[in-house]
Amino acid sequence: MRLSEIKEKIIKIYGKRSWEKIEESYEYKVYTGTEKEQISALIRDVYAIQYINNPTEKMKLEIVKQNGDAIKLISNPSEEMQLEAVEQRASAIEYIYNPSREVQLLSVQKSGYNIQYIKDPTEEIQLEAVRQNGIAIKYIKNPTKKVKLEAVKHNPFVIKYINNPSEKLKLLAVKQDGYVIEHIDNPSEKVQLEAVKKNVYSIACIHNPTDKVIQKAIKEFDIDDTCNLKYILRFIKNDLNEKDSKEDEV
C-alpha cells in the first residue's frame, strides 16, 4: 500500500488532525523525511537510525556526537566517527573493533580504566592509561617495568595490583606513602625503614618489624605524646610476648 493510500485511509477513519500529528512525529520523519528532517529526528533518538535505509555519513556522525555508545549501531565506522564517539563517551571504545592508535590514546587519556577494552595495548597506550589513573594497571596483563614504575609514581597504592613487585618498586611506593607497606608482603628491613621514615605511624601496618625499625620508630615518636607512648608500650608488650613464646617452645 502506497503512502498516499495509507494517508487517505487514516484521514477517513481518524480525521485530518490525526494524520497531521503523524506527520509531526519524529518517527514519521525517520521513515519519510529529508536528510535534514531525519537528522533532526535522530537527535531526539539516536537508535532510530536502525530504521533508516542506507543512512548517510552525516547521519552516522551526528548520532555518535549525541551518544558515543551509538557507534555500536554503525558498521565499519570511519576513524572520524570513532573519534567523535570516544570524545562524547570515552568508554565507547568498547564497541569499536580494532580502534586506531589515535582512538585508543584519546580513550585512555580521558579515563585510564578504558584500557580494559583494548586488546593487546602497546606500551605507549599502557603508559598513557596509568598516567591518567594508576589503578588502570589492574587491567593490564604483563605490564612492563616502565609501566609498573609509572603507575606507582602516580599512585603508590597500586603496588597491591602488581605481582611480585621489585625492591625498587616497593621503595618507591613507601617513600611516597608509608602506609603502602600494608600492601607489601614480607617487606625487607630497608623497605620497613623507609616506610617509618616517611610516616612513623605506618609501623602499625608492619607485621613483625625488625628491632632496628622499632628503634627508628621510637626515636621518631614524641615520648610526651600520650598517643605515641601507647604505640611504644605496645611494641614493648609485643616484643616481650614473642620472647616468652620462643622460650616456651624451647
Which residues make up each language-model segment?
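Alpha-helical scaffold segments
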Residues: 2-250
